[in-house]
Structures are given as C-alpha cells and as structure tokens.
Regions:
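The feature captures the beta-strand-to-loop junction immediately N-terminal to the Walker
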Residues: 47-49
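Helix-to-loop junction immediately C-terminal to a conserved catalytic motif
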Residues: 62
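ATP-binding/catalytic-site motifs of ATP-hydrolyzing domains
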Residues: 71-73, 77-78
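ABC ATPase NBD coupling module
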Residues: 78-98, 122-125
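Short coil-to-helix segment of the ABC ATPase nucleotide-binding domain corresponding to the Q-loop/switch region
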Residues: 104-112
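Short coil-to-helix "N-cap" segments within the ABC nucleotide-binding domain's helical subdomain
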Residues: 109, 117-131
Length: 131
C-alpha cells in the first residue's frame, strides 16, 4: 500500500472505460451511446442540468442499475454484469453531491474538496480549472 492506502491493483492498472452505453426508461433515452475513458487516480466531475443523465451514468458504472447496451471495463476487464460489491472491491467508488454531505458548498467548492484528497500540492490544485 502507498502512503494514502491506494490498493496495489489501483496503482498498476489502466482505468475505467465506458463504451457505447445506452439507457432508456419508458422508451425515453436517458443515455445515448456514451463513451468515456478515465485513468486510475483521476477525479472526475460530471456537470449538467437536471435530467441530463449524470446520476444514471454513475449508477450504471457502480452497478446500481443495468445499462441497455454498451460495456463497462475496469483495467480492460468487462465488469458490466458484476454486482456493486465486486466493483467496489476492484477500486470503484462514487461520491454523490448531496446537500447533507456538503452543506453550504457550491459545485466548484465540492470539486476542489475532492482535489484536496488527490492532489496534495495547493498550488497545483489552484491551476486546475473547473468549468
């Protein structure tokens, strides 16, 4: 383990790949052919209006709901059918923006609070742009 307790597997593997994920509810497409590549150790924030599919995508990645089409790969291993607890053991985690957790913080403050965990150098954190 490293100084911040990152599992060996998390340090020495590729990352998360979302390939062509589609999800519909009652014939309405919520996600349409979404693809995304994330490296291990990256902090990611999805920003968008209500109903854009952000939470749906995170729930699919974590295994809380099933996608209609597409693949979720972790370190090149297909995990789309794995239960949530197995994905968690493989190093996946999800921290939703809930008012009960981040009272009084705006979106930018929420993102910077996560960066404090992943980037210890205050000056490097400030150089990261939040859009």
């Amino acid at each position: 383990m490293s100084q911040i307790d990152i599992p060996f597997v998390a340090i020495h593997n590729k990352g998360l790949e979302i390939k062509n994920v589609t999800k519909s509810y009652n014939k309405k497409k919520i996600l349409d052919n979404v693809s995304l590549n994330l490296n291990r150790g990256e902090s990611v924030a999805l920003l968008g209006p209500n109903g854009a599919g952000k939470t749906t995508l995170f729930y699919i990645i974590m295994g809380l709901i099933k996608r209609d089409v597409g693949s979720i790969l972790l370190d090149k291993n297909e995990i789309s059918e794995l239960p949530m607890y197995r994905r968690s053991k493989m190093g996946l985690g999800y921290l939703p923006q809930e008012s009960s957790i981040f009272r009084g913080m705006n979106v930018e403050d929420n993102i910077y609070s996560i960066l404090e965990v992943t980037e210890s150098n205050k000056f490097k954190r400030k150089k990261i742009r939040v859009w």
